[in-house]
């Protein structure tokens, strides 16, 4: 039995010789946060910086005057002076798109010999966005 005892002791010895984890081997995300206040502050600063970045991204705004559906053969007959009748009435508000997504509606205005649009309605989902920092 002494041989069996020795073998089991040798196994214990071999197990104890296994590599002890170092700082590099430990996943720091699994350890408790020492400075949770600093971490929260850093996260808040990151969010504010991200918000500033997003709010400064340029976008394309398109105002849709109207739509019409015609055949290609009719389009090919167009020449200078041809008129295309649109489906929308002049009394209907114009759709305003941001990067292809409907965001608002409004009415056409002329300012200093340029077209403009007076916003008459903003899509509900956009009204809830807080842009103040």
UniProtKB/Swiss-Prot annotation:
InterPro entries: FliN, FliN-like_C, FliN/MopA/SpaO, FliN_T3SS_HrcQb, SpoA-like_sf. Residues 1-28 have a biased composition (Basic and acidic residues). One of its GO terms (cellular component) is plasma membrane. The keyword Membrane applies. GO terms for biological process: bacterial-type flagellum-dependent cell motility; chemotaxis. The keyword Cell membrane applies. Gene3D superfamilies: SpoA-like. Keywords: Bacterial flagellum, Cell membrane, Chemotaxis, Flagellar rotation, Membrane. It is a peripheral membrane protein. One of its GO terms (molecular function) is cytoskeletal motor activity. It is found in: Cell membrane; Bacterial flagellum basal body. Belongs to the FliN/MopA/SpaO family. FliN is one of three proteins (FliG, FliN, FliM) that form the rotor-mounted switch complex (C ring), located at the base of the basal body. This complex interacts with the CheY and CheZ chemotaxis proteins, in addition to contacting components of the motor that determine the direction of flagellar rotation. This is Flagellar motor switch protein FliN. It comes from Buchnera aphidicola subsp. Acyrthosiphon pisum (strain APS).
């Amino acid at each position: 039995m002494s041989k069996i005892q020795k073998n089991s002791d040798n196994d214990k010895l071999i197990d104890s010789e296994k590599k002890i984890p170092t700082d590099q081997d430990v996943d720091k995300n699994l350890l408790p946060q020492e400075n949770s206040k600093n971490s929260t502050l850093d996260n808040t600063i990151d969010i504010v910086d991200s918000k500033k970045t997003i709010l400064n991204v340029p976008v394309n705004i398109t105002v849709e005057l109207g739509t019409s559906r015609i055949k290609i053969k009719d389009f090919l007959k167009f020449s200078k002076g041809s008129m295309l009748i649109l489906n929308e009435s002049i009394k209907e508000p114009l759709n305003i798109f941001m990067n292809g997504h409907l965001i608002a509606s409004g009415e056409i205005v002329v300012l200093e010999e340029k077209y403009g649009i007076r916003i008459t309605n903003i899509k509900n989902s956009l009204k809830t966005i807080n842009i103040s920092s």
